[in-house]
Amino acid sequence: SLVGSEMCIRDSLNAGIMPSAPLSAMKTGDWHEMVDINIKGVLNGVAAVLPTFTAQKAGQVIATSSVAGLKAYPGAAVYGGTKWFVREFMEVLRIESAMEGTNIRTATLYPAAIHTELLHTISDPGTSAGMQALYEKHGITPDRIAGVVAFAIEQPADTNVTEFTVGPTSQPW
């Protein structure tokens, strides 16, 4: 645990929208909004803490991606792409921090069917109905994610746990 005059120890990045639809629907406005929130939100969050973390040679960034950032599924090409970005960005942040000796720990979460407000951001009726059915059958509560975040935080300063896929045991993907 960090003590003393450290101004900022952790940054948790958890903003995202999922207005998923088939590519043929050409919802380019939704695409731009996903990039603005799902990618630029992470960039801006890290930019806000990186100077402090670098100066104090300590810190931890925890970001929420999605299983869609690990696996492709119809209707989520752009959403999945924004979540793949989070994976890539966090891994490069971890590598560069190690190379520069700044001791910034990173953790990326890949939630599956977790009951949150995210489903309310789906813009395509067919995609929304399918995801609602999936979540009704398999969804689990957000406290499962909170437990994983606590685990990542509780690790000693010299230990980095980088990636967690979290989902219902009954969910097939």
Q: What is the predicted role of each segment?
A:
Residues A48-K57:
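A short helix-coil junction within the Rossmann-fold of NAD(P)-dependent oxidoreductases
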Residues I104, T108-L109, T127-W173:
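C-terminal helical subdomain
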Residues V46, T82:
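Active-site helix of classical SDR
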Residues P22-L23, D30-E33:
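Substrate-binding pocket helix/loop in short-chain dehydrogenase/reductase
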Residues S66:
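Residue(s) in the substrate-gating loop at a strand-loop-helix junction
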Residues S24, K71-A77:
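Active-site loop immediately N-terminal to the catalytic Tyr-X3-Lys motif
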Residues L2-I9:
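Short, small-residue-biased leader/transition segments that mark boundaries at the very start
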